[in-house]
Amino acid sequence: MVETQPSDVPLLAGISEESAALVTAGGVTDVPAGQVLAQAGDPGFGMFVVLDGTVVVERGDLHLDIERNGFFGELALLVPGSPRIARVRARTDARVLAIPREAFDQLLETEPSLARGLLRELAARLVQARTGH
């Protein structure tokens, strides 16, 4: 299997080398299948990008698979102090990149394309949640 690097992730494509260093400062973690990455109610400190594998976001009857190049936990960045709203666990063995709030805030200042990509994805998720498509 070819491992995905942060620069391969569409959301992060085209960012400067300096910004890429900020992104990777949060660290990459290998997560075994079944392991819980976040619980609803946990404090949110940042977002995660799935580099390999699949994680599932579980909230009530909603189960949303986030696969390679996808991300989760972004609400913690957009609404400071907000707790996690769902449980997230690895459906398969996975590699995730953590992006802490401080790094994300700096990225938004220097990389407007990141904000646009994030907004597009959030809008698509909202449409999917409301329409089922």
Language-model segments: residues:
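Structural motif
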Residues: P10-A13, G70, T92, P112
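A small-molecule sensor/coupling module
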Residues: D8, I15-E18, P83-I85, E102-H133
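Residues at structural and domain junctions
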Residues: Q5-V9, A20, Q39, E74, ...
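Cyclic nucleotide-binding regulatory domains
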Residues: D30, Q35-D93
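Short, flexible helix/strand-to-coil boundary loops that buttress conserved ligand/catalytic motifs
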Residues: D61, G70, A76, P100, ...
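Cyclic nucleotide-binding regulatory module and flanking cytosolic helices
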Residues: M1-A33, L77-P80
